[in-house]
């Protein structure tokens, strides 16, 4: 069971901005209500400009979280578009491989965090492509979305996810994140479940998932050329 959670900003530094303070407070309280101890790593709240200009600090936070024996879960604050810049500080001297040696910590996040998942996959760490702190735990609508909450609770209580089934609801994206949106639910619509595009409805094998835009960048290489 998870007890201690480290929040890291490996992509964008939005979480450290004053305009996101009300969301941070909501998320921190929700985690505390689960009985979790939340630790924001030293640079997690450094803000957009610092995080943008100092990928070495982002990498240092990730390494410190893995090295800390008290941390059970590493939760990414939010995605972004440049976490690839951490690579030299994680791989040049084998820093990441050394830091994760023997670890069974949960690593959780999505979007640009796909890159971090692949980095950790490279050094043999199993990760969970799922909730981020700001986007999901800090949801303004009064509570975490039910589908999100269901799997988050399973993960912190059991350390794993046994099976993923479709949500019966989809939600329109929130466009206003100001304090006045606190308690305002997202417009919801019925969902029809998985859609089979081709092939057999039953198949087995290993799969690497993630953000399709980020995965495309791995092969295209043109975005930051």
PLM region spans:
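Conserved anion/nucleotide-ligand pocket segment
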Residues: 126-213
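Short, acidic/small-residue loops that bind anionic groups at enzyme active sites
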Residues: 90-122, 126-134
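General beta-strand structural signal in soluble alpha/beta enzymes
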Residues: 39-42, 75-76, 107-110, 127-130, ...
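Oxyanion-binding "anion nests"
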Residues: 207-225
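Long, hydrophobic/aromatic-enriched structural stretches that serve as scaffold segments
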Residues: 70-91
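ATP/NTP phosphate-donor binding region
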Residues: 1-70
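Gly/Ser/Thr-rich loops at beta-strand to alpha-helix junctions
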Residues: 11-15, 78-83, 108-109, 113-115
């Amino acid at each position: 069971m998870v007890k201690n959670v480290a929040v890291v900003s490996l992509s964008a530094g939005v979480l450290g901005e004053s305009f996101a303070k009300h969301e941070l407070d909501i998320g921190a309280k929700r985690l505390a209500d689960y009985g979790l101890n939340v630790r924001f790593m030293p640079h997690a709240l450094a803000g957009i400009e610092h995080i943008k200009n100092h990928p070495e600090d982002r990498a240092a936070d990730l390494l410190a979280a893995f090295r800390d024996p008290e941390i059970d879960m590493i939760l990414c604050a939010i995605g972004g578009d440049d976490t690839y810049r951490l690579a030299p500080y994680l791989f040049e001297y084998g820093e990441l491989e050394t830091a994760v040696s023997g670890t069974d910590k949960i690593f959780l996040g999505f979007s640009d965090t796909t890159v971090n998942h692949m980095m950790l996959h490279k050094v043999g760490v199993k990760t969970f492509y799922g909730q981020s702190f700001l986007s999901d735990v800090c949801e303004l609508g009064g509570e975490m979305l039910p589908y999100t909450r269901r799997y988050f609770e399973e993960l912190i209580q059991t350390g794993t996810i046994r099976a993923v089934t479709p949500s019966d609801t989809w939600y329109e994206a929130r466009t206003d994140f100001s304090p006045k949106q606190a308690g305002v639910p997202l417009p919801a619509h019925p969902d029809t479940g998985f859609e089979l595009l081709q092939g057999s409805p039953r198949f087995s094998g290993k799969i690497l998932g993630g953000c399709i835009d980020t995965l495309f960048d791995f092969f295209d290489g043109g975005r930051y050329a």
